Amino acid sequence: MMATPNQTACNAESPVALEEAKTSGAPGSPQTPPERHDSGGSLPLTPRMESHSEDEDLAGAVGGLGWNSRSPRTQSPGGCSAEAVLARKKHRRRPSKRKRHWRPYLELSWAEKQQRDERQSQRASRVREEMFAKGQPVAPYNTTQFLMNDRDPEEPNLDVPHGISHPGSSGESEAGDSDGRGRAHGEFQRKDFSETYERFHTESLQGRSKQELVRDYLELEKRLSQAEEETRRLQQLQACTGQQSCRQVEELAAEVQRLRTENQRLRQENQMWNREGCRCDEEPGT
């Protein structure tokens, strides 16, 4: 800080002259307290220095609220106020770098759906245990699993016709009902198996790569050609067998016709011999 001309003049005077000037003042003038000076000839406090000390006190008060008064952010060379310091010191939130890759439930595979349901069930059980330990009312876990557990495996299928019941016989009606339930149960099992197999087959195909799908397609074409060759061979064999069977049938039919003709001839001869025998018996008696 640069010294003013008044301060330079005060430094030029000796301490003895300053004391004499203070004691030899006007008799009516008020007595001013003597100013303190150090032995090194330091300058007295100026209004600028006093204002700077007040800013330091204000900065210290702000530091008592949790701010560091000696940090370069809270104390500037120009002597900033507390409002400016507080306005400058703001916490800016940044977006989280961790991104959650969320997928819809319908796009998940069967294994991923089971894993998500298992995690949700474990989390719900843990929360319910914590609430029960704190004495809070606990509601049952909101899930549809109880519907699957309570589903009747013998649920009748409305598309399958039931047996006609006769009101006159109770035993026959019970037998018809049990038979209808058995058919409905079998139809339900076949339908459930086909749906499960189709879902599993679709998921397995979705999990394969393009090269694997091409290799499977070529393998299926090879099996199809083998099956077609086997079908043609069986058809030819069946045709040959059919021709042989037709020939045998024709031979047997001809043999049957021959035997019928022979039988008819023998019957006629037998009748003729019977007539001749009767004629011979009548002649000796006459």
From Swiss-Prot:
Main subcellular location of this protein, as a coarse class: nucleus
Cellular component annotations (GO), alphabetically ordered: cytoplasm; cytosol; nuclear speck; nucleoplasm; nucleus
Coiled coil: 207-277
Localization per Swiss-Prot or TrEMBL: Nucleus
Compositional bias annotation for Basic and acidic residues: 113-132, 178-195
Alphabetized UniProt keyword annotations: Coiled coil, Nucleus, Phosphoprotein, Repressor, Transcription, Transcription regulation
Keyword Cytoplasm: no
Compositional bias of kind Basic residues: 87-103
Highest rank taxon of the organism: Eukaryota
Molecular function GO terms recorded: 7SK snRNA binding; cyclin-dependent protein serine/threonine kinase inhibitor activity; identical protein binding; snRNA binding
Residue numbers spanned by region Disordered: 1-195
Residue ranges, annotated region (Interaction with P-TEFb): 140-143
Chain intervals for the UniProt region annotation (Interaction with CCNT1, HEXIM1 and HEXIM2): 226-286
InterPro entries xrefs: HEXIM (IPR024872)
Record has Zinc-finger as a keyword: no
Protein name: Protein HEXIM2
GN (gene name): HEXIM2
